[in-house]
Amino acid sequence: TKKTNEGVPITNLSLAYPEVRQYWLGLLRETLAYGTDGIQLHLNRSEPYVFYEEPVVSAFREKYGEDPRGLSLEDPRWVEHSASYLTQFIREVRQLLDEKPNRNLGVTLSGRENGRPAHYEENHCDVDTWIGEGLVDYLMVTPYLHASLLQHWRSLGGDKLHIWPDLMPRAQTAASYARLAQRYYRAGADGLCLWDGERRSARISEWAAVRQLGHRQNLDQIIRDGPYYYRWAELKTLGGFDVKWSFKDG
């Protein structure tokens, strides 16, 4: 398992250990054997993926001559060192996928509305390296993806990289969904994703818009007509009875 800088165990397994990586790769291999055409890793949970386990600390000491347990979590050397273990796992997943042609790797990442690279500084996901080595096919960023970061990744990955930002918050008006989709498309997104999609359609008008967001030519119309989707009207009577004071318990 992972360990804090005081040596206290953490419940999550550490990718610093080859045996742990092989365990996860074994599960992924079993999944692929059912005929799936790819793998998606949710890297916005249980991050970062190594902490202060013995091999991590020893390798850092050998490289920098310093104990990382006394450093800030934001120390650039520590972030780079920690990220290297996850990158190694991503390489191994890519190698597994490439045993057969046309299998894709998607990753879900954490993003910040203010453009701060939380995926790297906090979660130690070295996305630039993954793109540069051609390891990933899909980037799905939640809850927000700043336009500048989207454009940066697009410049690194070109058209072959799929970048699908999440549409947050979960509950929005139809017009709000369409405006957000337009903003991401203009920045270079080629698709969109919905984290917790099964909990998104609190109102039928939302789904009436969301189901069309992949059709860019419809977005202006959604913005214009969205406020009129499935309007509700308050009933004053039902079956001849006053609704306000009827149909109560007892």
Predicted stretch roles:
Residues 28, 40-47, 75-121, 160-170:
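Aromatic-lined carbohydrate-recognition surfaces of secreted/lumenal glycan-active proteins
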